[in-house]
C-alpha cells in the first residue's frame, strides 16, 4: 500500500512573501504596503478629445481597471483633464486618473493648475524630464507641484528613453573597470540607478515615500526580470510592473505574462499594467482582462468567476462544449459589472465545461457547478454536478441553454437574496 511521504517542498504551494514596500494612496486606491495588487491601464485617445476620453476611461473602469493613465502632452490635453474628471464623476466613476508627462510636464502643470489638481498621480520619466542644466529645475518643478496639491508621483524609467548622461557615465566607468560587464548589464544598472537617484532627489525636495511609486520598464523579458529584482533589493518604494512595447496579440500577452508572472511569484510588484498593442479597431479593455486573468490565475486576486474547459481532442469532434464554454465565459464577463453589487462574492465561483467522459465528471465535481458534455460516440446525455454532487442530467438540443439557466439559478441561490436570507436566519437562530 502506498504511503503519504513526509512533508517536503511539495507541501506548500504559493508565491514568495510580498516584498515589503511603503504604501501610497493614489486617489482612493492603496498601492503597496501589503494592499492587493492593483490593475492599471492607459487610454489611447487624444486626451484633448474630452468625450472620447471619458468614454474610454469609463470602459476601462467598467472592465475592472483600478487606475487609468492618459497622455498629457500639450496645452489642449492639459486643459481637458479637469473636464474629463468632472464628466467621469457625473457618471459615478471615481477611478484615479494619472497624467503621463514627457518633456514639458513642468510647464503644463504650471500653466494649468486645474489639471494639476484634477489628476491623482503624475508620471515622470527621468530620461526626458529635462536635459543638461534644465533637468534638475524641471524635475523640481513637477515634484513641488505634486507636494503642493498632495499628489502621488510615479518615477518611471524606460529602456527606450533612458537618461543618456547617466548611461554614458556608467559605460565609461565600466570600460575602465578591471572586469567590465557587457553593455546590457550596464544598461540595466543605469535603469535602476535612474529610478533610485530620481526618487532620492524627490525626497530631498520634500516628497515623502508615501507618495512615490517606481518603475523601470524594459521590452525584453529577461532584462525586465533582472532590473526589477535589483530595484526591489535596493529599496522599499512601491513598485509598478510592466513590460514596455510588449507587442500585439498572443506575443504581447505571453511576453507580459512570462515576465510579470515570475516577478509576482517572487513577491515583487504592487501595481501592474499589461501594455498590449491593440489590433486596428480592437478593444482597449483587453489589457485589463489579461491583467486580471494573470492575477487571478496565480491566486493573488479574484475578479470574475473562473470557467474551466478542456482543450478538446479526438474524443470531442463536436464543437458544442467549446461554444458553451465561450458562451458562459462571455456571459459572466459581460454581467460582472452588475453582479459585483448584486451578488457579493460571485467572483469566487468556479464553473467547469468539459467535453467527454475521461476528465469531465471529475473536473465538474471539483467546480461549484460543472457539466460533462458527451464526447464522440458517447450517449447524448450531459450530467451536471453542483457542489461536488450529481444534480441532474441534461439531454436534447437545448443542453447549452439549459446549463446556462442552471448557472444563473446557482448564482442567485448562492449569492443572491435567498442566500442573504438564509444567512440572516442562521444568525438570528444563534
Curated annotation (Swiss-Prot):
The keyword Oxidoreductase applies. It catalyses: (2E)-4-hydroxy-3-methylbut-2-enyl diphosphate + oxidized [flavodoxin] + H2O + 2 H(+) = 2-C-methyl-D-erythritol 2,4-cyclic diphosphate + reduced [flavodoxin]. One of its GO terms (biological process) is isopentenyl diphosphate biosynthetic process, methylerythritol 4-phosphate pathway. The keyword Oxidoreductase applies. Its cofactor is [4Fe-4S] cluster. Converts 2C-methyl-D-erythritol 2,4-cyclodiphosphate (ME-2,4cPP) into 1-hydroxy-2-methyl-2-(E)-butenyl 4-diphosphate. This is 4-hydroxy-3-methylbut-2-en-1-yl diphosphate synthase (flavodoxin). It comes from Nitrobacter winogradskyi (strain ATCC 25391 / DSM 10237 / CIP 104748 / NCIMB 11846 / Nb-255).
Amino acid at each position: 500500500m502506498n504511503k503519504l511521504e513526509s512533508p517536503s517542498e511539495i507541501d506548500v504551494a504559493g508565491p514568495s512573501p510580498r516584498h515589503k514596500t511603503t504604501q501610497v494612496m493614489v486617489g482612493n486606491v492603496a498601492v503597496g504596503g501589503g494592499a492587493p495588487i492593483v490593475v492599471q491601464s492607459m487610454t489611447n485617445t487624444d486626451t484633448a478629445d474630452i468625450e472620447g476620453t471619458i468614454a474610454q476611461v469609463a470602459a476601462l473602469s467598467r472592465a475592472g481597471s483600478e487606475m487609468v493613465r492618459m497622455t498629457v502632452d500639450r496645452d489642449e490635453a492639459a486643459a481637458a483633464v479637469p473636464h474629463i474628471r468632472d464628466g467621469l464623476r457625473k457618471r459615478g466613476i471615481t477611478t484615479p486618473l494619472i497624467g503621463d508627462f514627457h518633456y514639458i510636464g513642468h510647464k503644463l502643470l504650471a500653466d494649468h493648475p486645474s489639471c494639476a489638481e484634477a489628476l491623482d498621480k503624475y508620471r515622470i520619466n527621468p530620461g526626458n524630464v529635462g536635459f543638461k542644466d534644465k533637468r534638475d529645475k524641471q524635475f523640481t518643478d513637477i515634484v513641488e507641484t505634486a507636494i503642493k496639491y498632495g499628489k502621488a508621483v510615479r518615477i518611471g524609467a524606460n529602456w527606450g528613453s533612458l537618461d543618456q548622461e547617466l548611461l554614458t557615465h556608467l559605460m565609461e566607468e565600466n570600460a575602465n573597470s578591471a572586469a567590465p560587464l557587457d553593455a546590457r548589464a550596464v544598461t540595466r544598472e543605469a535603469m535602476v540607478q535612474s529610478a533610485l537617484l530620481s526618487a532620492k532627489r524627490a525626497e530631498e525636495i520634500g516628497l515623502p515615500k508615501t507618495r512615490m511609486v517606481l518603475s523601470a520598464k524594459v521590452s525584453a523579458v529577461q532584462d525586465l526580470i533582472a532590473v526589477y529584482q535589483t530595484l526591489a533589493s535596493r529599496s522599499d518604494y512601491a513598485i509598478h510592473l510592466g513590460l514596455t512595447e510588449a507587442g500585439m496579440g498572443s506575443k504581447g500577452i505571453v511576453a507580459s505574462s512570462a515576465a510579470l508572472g515570475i516577478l509576482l511569484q517572487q513577491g515583487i510588484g504592487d501595481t501592474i499594467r499589461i501594455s498590449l498593442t491593440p489590433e486596428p479597431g480592437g478593444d482597449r479593455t483587453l489589457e485589463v482582462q489579461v491583467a486580471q486573468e494573470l492575477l487571478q490565475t496565480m491566486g493573488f486576486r479574484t475578479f470574475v468567476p473562473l470557467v474551466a474547459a478542456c482543450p478538446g481532442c479526438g474524443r470531442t469532434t463536436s464543437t458544442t462544449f467549446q461554444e458553451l464554454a465561450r458562451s458562459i465565459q462571455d456571459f459572466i464577463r459581460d454581467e460582472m459589472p452588475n453582479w459585483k453589487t448584486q451578488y457579493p462574492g460571485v467572483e469566487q465561483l468556479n464553473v467547469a465545461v468539459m467535453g467527454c467522459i475521461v476528465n469531465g465528471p471529475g473536473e465538474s465535481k471539483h467546480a461549484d457547478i460543472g457539466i460533462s458534455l458527451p464526447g464522440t460516440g458517447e450517449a447524448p446525455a450531459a450530467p451536471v454536478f453542483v457542489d461536488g454532487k450529481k444534480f441532474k442530467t441534461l439531454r436534447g438540443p437545448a443542453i447549452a441553454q439549459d446549463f446556462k439557466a442552471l448557472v444563473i439559478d446557482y448564482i442567485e441561490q448562492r449569492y443572491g437574496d435567498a442566500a442573504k436570507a438564509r444567512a440572516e436566519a442562521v444568525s438570528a437562530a444563534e
